Amino acid sequence: MGCRLSFAVTEPARFATQIAPATTAGVVSDERLGITLNGAPVGDVTEHRGAHGARIHLFACGPGELTVDCATVLGAAPIGRSIGPRNGGDEPDDTVEALVALRQSRYCESDRLVGFAATEFPGAQGDDPYTTAVRVSSWVFERLAYASGASDHLDSAVDTLLTGAGVCRDYAHLTIALCRALGIPARLASVYAPGLFPMDFHAVTEVLVAGVWLALDSTRLAPRAELVRIATGRDAADSAFATVLEGRAELLEVEVFASSDRDLAVDDHVSPVSLA
């Protein structure tokens, strides 16, 4: 799995990318990260650790044609889909993380959807949180039309609700915002998704239930058991695959590939699934 990003850099720029699988995703058997400007390697690329094993690469370059290539092969062992405790170590405290995942954020204005959510999902407060989250995810799946180009990087959950169309991040943002409005901690995970068509970076929702983060894909375009975590955050603002920190650059092309050497799992999009 991996990707190739192409940029036209028009003035000296600094970049941050989140394209390598998270350290929690599994054992890496082979990996390549190549960053070139006009065909020559870019030096001084540093890797930094983000939340939940995210790997952030920082680098700078001058004007020219920039290409970022990343390819990773994970070991054949299952990548931890069972329901169980979250990986320990330096992860955020459960209570603090739950509080953050309940608050409105840039693309998930849950505070504006409290009344709507209460009306659309009556009785949700008394239901099991995961059952409610599945109801929300199914509602988003039925309500929205998946349409490339129907939204842009400025569109939020409320915009998506009004337009009724979007792509994976829009589905995730609306699902997250509605879950938060119903009192369920929710966050976004960017992932590689074997089986996804058309192939691209993918975004799904995670909800916190009884101390475990469970994944929901409101697009239903890929089996959750095959997803490989890249980054995790409040919304797409925390999980962007590339950010221009300084300078000026235009993204020209994105190519993503992800496959598995085994038969893809069948997903009913109801049973609980936890990402590694």
In which residue ranges do the predicted regions lie?
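Intrinsically disordered, low-complexity N-terminal segments that are enriched in acidic
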Residues: 1-83, 87
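Hydrophobic/aromatic-rich core segments of domains that either
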Residues: 6, 123, 138, 170-248
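Secondary-structure boundary elements
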Residues: 9, 68, 74-78, 84, ...
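Generic structural "secondary-structure junction" signal
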Residues: 17, 35, 61, 76, ...
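Short intrinsically disordered coil segments
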Residues: 20-22, 84-95, 219-223, 245-246
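Glycine-rich loops and low-complexity Gly/Arg-rich segments
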Residues: 29-32, 41-43, 59-61, 93-97, ...
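Low-complexity, flexible helical/coil segments
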Residues: 39-45, 52-57, 70, 105-113, ...
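Residue-level signal for pocket-adjacent positions within structured domains
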Residues: 51-54, 97, 156, 211, ...
